[in-house]
């Protein structure tokens, strides 16, 4: 009601920020030539399921990082130690991998990781290949080889859409993956080689921490609504303006 009620009594129009939000997301996913790449992070598949399903149909390349990558890795038979994982979503992860393949969307997972035995400040960490994660370890960030993989793909696309941090960015040094990729996107955007769109609460916080957010083409302030737009859903506040 909060986004639709006023329009029942008064003439209503979208504001400049809403116009730009819709324009930039539509441009990133639907308009123009060139390949499109998505970066999806965060902790859970369940919170971004519809986003993942929609993006496999819209994008040429989709990188999955953050905690949700662990569920995909486990679904593919990798050991993930004590890492965050949604075991109830394993079948869903397999289905998304299959859908991406059928839609010719290249879905990429981490090839290495930064691991630790706990999430305490100052904890010791190490770099391992993704098939070498010990049983007592936590995957807390993507590793340097994965950063290289993402950056190499970024150089081949015209548009990048980002939603969700790639590691436990609140704890040093597990912000490294997020900051490194943000730096590369910033560089390519400034060189006018890339249109870059990012959004989602944690994403905005992580990018602000990296100080590279100012160079992105567009940073969404819509929070959860950004996810809904990425998922291809109709938002009540927008639909009512079409009447």
Q: Where do the protein language model's features map onto the residues?
A:
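Active-site loop-to-helix "anion-binding N-cap" substructures in soluble metabolic enzymes
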Residues: 1-243
